[in-house]
Every structure is written in structure tokens, then in C-alpha cells.
């Protein structure tokens, strides 16, 4: 919604100016700011205390959100033979090899995640310039280049998300839908924060979680207390 719209201003009024919310309170508040005829997505934006220009301070990885994302995730798999059959049985939306590459070369990118078996990566490389900028390129580090396609498909369909810090040291991720309970959103938030702390670069100095906000699609940002790194569903003391 436009920041000048009545709906946006009404949503903004529900956020206490100057308050930094405990995670559970932030989730309750962000649900109150939802204003839409559809079920908007709840996103988190995190400013990290890292220098992404340095290779030893890149932050990226995956995490399985305990309550899923609430979104129907479309998954494509580059595989053939038994692996292709396994991918289809696991629920992959599109499975293929050369023909899938050609389809993507033709401009098709109507999917949310891509998985490939190692033997197909040479073919996938032909569309790296299409998939890479969109964050869709299969990568061993995120578990999307694998021989266990069944596990990979089920994890992504079940709520596994990828995250990566951008050039400005910001990281964005989905936490769920506004229809989720505040507890479900806080649990998903906690899973992400726990994983971010686990993969914190040893070279990072100073405060790691510098700023955290949550918001619904096109809605105002709710500040989250970045010092809370446990008991995410607990009320502020």
C-alpha cells in the first residue's frame, strides 16, 4: 500500500513510536497492521554487522521454518532416470533435463526453487545467468545440488528457505503469513535467528544483529529487539 494511503497511515498508528518490541509482541503487532483482501506475507529485514565485500564475512545458508512459510512453493528438479522418478514422487512441480534448460532459456522462471543432481550441473550451467541473479541457481551449500532429491524436494516444500546477505549487509526472509498465529511467526523467527547466529562469521566484529524489523507486504515496519536471542515466544519482561 502507498505510504500516503489512509490504510497505511492507520496501520502505522498501531505501532508505538520509539518502542522496540520483543519478538512475540512484534508478531502480534505486525498481524494488526495487515490490511489487505488477501493473506499478506510477513517478512523480516535484518541489518548484519558484517562486511559482505570480504569473502570471510559472507552470510548465507538455509533453515527449515518449523511452521512453514504458508506459501505454495513451486520446485523444479534437473534430474533423469530414477532420480527424476523420485523427484516426481516427492512432489516436484517440473522435472526434466535438456528440455527444462531450453524452457528456462526461453524466459520461463515461474518457480521458487531449483534442485539438481550433480550429473546435471553442466546442463544447468547453461542457464546460470538466468537463475543466478534470481537466487535460483542450485548450490551444494544450500543442499540444492544433491543425489537425495526426495529429501531436498520435501524440505523445500515443507518450509525450508534460503537466506543470503546482500551488498549492503541486509538480509531479507519470509516468516509466514499474516494468518499465522503470533506464536507460529515467533517460532519461525527464532529458527532463523538461531541459524544466523550459528553461521556467524568468525571475522565479524562488533554487534552482529544490528537492526531487525518485521512487516507485512507493503506495510509499515515493526522494530524488533535484536538483543533477544532465546525464548522468542516469551513476553517482554
Curated annotation (Swiss-Prot):
One of its GO terms (cellular component) is large ribosomal subunit. PROSITE patterns: RIBOSOMAL_L1. GO terms for biological process: regulation of translation; translation. GO terms for molecular function: rRNA binding; structural constituent of ribosome; tRNA binding. Signal peptide: none annotated. InterPro entries: Ribosom_uL1_bac-type, Ribosomal_uL1, Ribosomal_uL1-like, Ribosomal_uL1/biogenesis, Ribosomal_uL1_3-a/b-sand, Ribosomal_uL1_CS. Keywords: Repressor, Ribonucleoprotein, Ribosomal protein, RNA-binding, rRNA-binding, Translation regulation, tRNA-binding. Pfam families: Ribosomal_L1 (PF00687). The keyword Cell membrane does not apply. NCBIfam families: rplA_bact. Part of the 50S ribosomal subunit. Binds directly to 23S rRNA. The L1 stalk is quite mobile in the ribosome, and is involved in E site tRNA release. Protein L1 is also a translational repressor protein, it controls the translation of the L11 operon by binding to its mRNA. Belongs to the universal ribosomal protein uL1 family. This is Large ribosomal subunit protein uL1. It comes from Corynebacterium kroppenstedtii (strain DSM 44385 / JCM 11950 / CIP 105744 / CCUG 35717). The gene is rplA.
Amino acid at each position: 500500500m502507498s505510504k500516503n494511503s489512509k490504510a497505511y497511515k492507520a496501520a502505522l498508528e498501531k505501532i508505538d513510536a520509539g518502542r522496540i518490541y520483543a519478538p512475540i509482541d512484534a508478531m502480534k503487532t505486525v498481524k494488526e497492521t495487515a490490511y489487505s483482501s488477501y493473506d499478506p506475507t510477513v517478512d523480516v529485514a535484518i541489518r548484519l554487522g558484517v562486511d559482505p565485500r570480504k569473502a570471510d564475512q559472507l552470510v548465507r545458508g538455509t533453515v527449515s521454518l518449523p511452521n512453514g512459510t504458508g506459501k505454495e512453493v513451486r520446485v523444479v528438479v534437473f534430474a533423469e532416470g530414477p532420480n527424476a522418478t523420485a523427484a516426481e514422487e516427492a512432489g516436484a512441480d517440473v522435472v526434466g533435463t535438456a528440455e527444462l534448460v531450453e524452457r528456462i532459456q526461453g524466459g520461463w522462471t515461474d518457480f521458487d526453487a531449483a534442485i539438481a543432481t550433480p550429473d546435471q550441473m553442466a546442463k544447468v550451467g547453461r542457464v546460470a545467468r538466468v537463475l543466478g541473479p534470481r537466487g535460483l541457481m542450485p548450490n551444494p551449500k544450500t543442499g540444492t545440488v544433491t543425489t537425495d532429491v526426495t529429501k531436498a524436494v520435501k524440505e523445500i516444500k515443507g518450509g525450508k528457505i534460503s537466506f543470503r546477505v546482500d551488498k549492503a549487509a541486509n538480509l531479507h526472509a519470509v516468516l509466514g503469513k499474516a494468518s499465522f498465529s503470533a506464536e507460529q511467526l515467533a517460532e519461525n523467527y527464532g529458527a532463523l535467528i538461531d541459524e544466523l547466529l550459528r553461521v556467524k562469521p568468525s571475522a565479524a566484529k562488533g554487534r552482529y544483529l544490528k537492526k531487525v524489523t518485521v512487516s507485512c507486504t507493503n506495510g509499515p515496519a515493526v522494530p524488533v529487539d535484536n538483543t533477544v536471542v532465546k525464548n522468542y515466544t516469551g513476553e517482554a519482561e
